[in-house]
Curated annotation (Swiss-Prot):
Belongs to the oxygen-dependent FAD-linked oxidoreductase family. It comes from Penicillium janthinellum (Penicillium vitale). This is FAD-linked oxidoreductase janO. Coiled coil: none annotated. Its EC number is 1.1.1.-. The keyword Flavoprotein applies. Its cofactor is FAD. InterPro entries: FAD-bd_PCMH, FAD-bd_PCMH-like_sf, FAD-bd_PCMH_sub1, FAD-bd_PCMH_sub2, FAD-linked_Oxidoreductase, Oxid_FAD_bind_N. Keywords: FAD, Flavoprotein, Oxidoreductase. FAD-linked oxidoreductase; part of the gene cluster that mediates the biosynthesis of the indole diterpenes janthitremanes such as shearinine K or shearinine A. The geranylgeranyl diphosphate (GGPP) synthase janG catalyzes the first step in janthitremane biosynthesis via conversion of farnesyl pyrophosphate and isopentyl pyrophosphate into geranylgeranyl pyrophosphate (GGPP). Condensation of indole-3-glycerol phosphate with GGPP by the prenyl transferase janC then forms 3-geranylgeranylindole (3-GGI). The lineage of its organism: Eukaryota, Fungi, Dikarya, Ascomycota, Pezizomycotina. Pathway: Secondary metabolite biosynthesis. The keyword Oxidoreductase applies.
């Protein structure tokens, strides 16, 4: 069999415009200036093996890109061999087991459309453009994580190419250390994933939502209502609270948004009934039991978070027992107004008694995130500072259990991304499988970008 020619651009001899187009394939236009030594867009596993050999020959770091949606832009590392998996694509469903096998560059939208034809579902990312690679390796806070669990919990096996160029299958029974790390080690995973094998769920055919928006001065009233009603809500309802400023909202507002997956319209309406019957008065917008779909929700999110804007975000898990209303009051009610938008986000996580045996090891009942969306690069320092300062202040008060590794800022706000035992094990696995630190080192080492 003839192996297709390696699709590669070398920094020093590629047409500058073509090299920059390949380099800058990121959702976030606030990206590092780091210039990879070469960029490879593999279409075969042999191409990926060749990339590892080139990294060794050139004594270079390896960097990976799946969907390019990482707001941290970790795929850009100075003088690295960047393996962009955009064209390395595969989707297959096993009818007998309900397991779907996918490559890292397959997006949430693509996976769910594919599974819908099989009447199956997977708790993918909240954005349709999110590639599964980074999403799963970082744990996967996906659709209705409160009830459906973290996406990495659905992983049954993973296929990888090691930094030494070996092809491995990893499962609880084979290369179990790599399988353990694949569920939550994030950018410290010391191999290149070529395929994820994922359990799926039955597809509930009906999706409806409720959305209510109030002025931010109603913050306490809204949060109290949500916390009181939360224990009574169906597991098939995903409730969230947003605080935001957008160009068409000159004052900060607070929004409650919930969608439900159900067997029928009647069932969905009944499940949402407690929300539209009890929500606080004074809402500027009231939308009860509106027909929707996951794809429609993806499109709505796309309008708020367009590709090519500048983004800065940070996300945390609050310490158990924290007074959520007091802890988050300032971040939800004093968002800075700007040209594109500021978003504060809260989603409840269900505290299961025990997580599966995996690297993902820090979570609590409350997940909170801040995001700045803007266009002017001269605003970078300002936008970064208000978000980091907010969480640094909360950390000084003992309110933060840990930080979501997918939004980590290891230089500007180092924090806990795993439990101490999990962190130690991730480091040991990294040294074993990537002794020269070609791939690992984004979190644990400095000067890697």
């Amino acid at each position: 069999m003839t192996i297709p020619e390696l699709p590669i651009l070398w920094r020093d001899n590629a047409p500058p415009s073509e090299y920059e187009a390949w380099r800058s394939r990121t959702f976030n236009s606030k990206r590092p200036d780091a210039q990879p030594l070469a960029i490879i867009k593999p279409t075969t596993i042999d191409h990926i093996v060749s990339a590892t050999a080139l990294a060794k020959e050139n004594n270079a770091k390896l960097a990976l890109r799946s969907g390019g949606h990482s707001l941290q832009c970790w795929s850009l590392r100075k003088d690295s061999i960047l393996v962009d998996l955009e064209n390395f694509r595969y989707l297959e469903f096993d009818d007998a087991t309900g397991v779907v096998s996918v490559t890292p560059s397959v997006t949430s939208s693509e996976l769910l459309l594919f599974l819908a034809n099989k009447k199956r579902f997977f708790p993918s990312g909240h954005s349709g453009e999110v590639g599964l690679g980074g999403f799963l390796l970082q744990g996967g806070i996906g659709l209705n994580a409160r009830s459906y669990g973290y996406a990495c919990e659905y992983l049954t096996a993973v296929d990888v190419v090691t930094v030494s160029g070996e092809v491995k299958h990893c499962s609880p029974d084979e290369n179990a250390d790599l399988f353990w790390a694949a569920r939550g080690a994030g950018p410290e995973f010391p191999a290149i994933v070529t395929r994820f094998h994922l359990n799926t769920r039955p597809l509930l055919p009906t999706v409806k939502r409720c959305t209510y928006i109030w002025p931010a001065v109603c913050y306490e009233m809204v949060f109290k209502w949500v916390l009181e009603i939360l224990p009574t809500l169906s597991d098939d309802i995903e409730p969230t609270i947003f605080g935001f400023t957008l160009p068409n909202t000159p004052i900060p507002v607070i929004a409650f948004h919930a969608h439900v997956h159900a067997e029928s319209d009647e069932s969905a309406i009944e499940l949402l009934k407690p929300l539209h019957e009890s929500h606080p008065a004074g809402a500027m917008v009231e939308q009860d039991c509106v027909d929707t779909s996951v794809q429609q929700e993806f499109e709505s999110g796309h309008a708020i978070m367009p590709p090519g804007a500048r983004y800065f975000t940070d996300s945390v898990f609050l310490t158990p027992g924290t007074d959520i209303i007091e802890a988050c009051r300032e971040m939800f009610t004093t968002l800075p107004a700007q040209a594109a938008g500021s978003i504060a986000y809260w989603e409840p996580m269900k505290q299961r008694t025990k997580l599966p045996e995996m690297a993902w090891s820090i979570h609590s009942e409350h997940y909170v995130s801040l995001m700045a969306i803007y266009g002017d690069q001269n605003q970078d320092h300002k936008q970064q500072t208000w978000i980091l300062d907010c969480f640094k202040d909360m950390d000084r008060k003992g309110l933060l259990l840990g930080t979501y590794v997918g939004d980590a800022h290891p230089k500007d706000r180092p924090h806990h991304y795993w439990s101490d035992p999990a962190k130690e094990r991730i480091q040991k696995i990294g040294v074993q499988w990537d002794p020269e630190a070609r791939l690992r080192g984004t979190i644990f080492a400095e000067n890697t970008l």
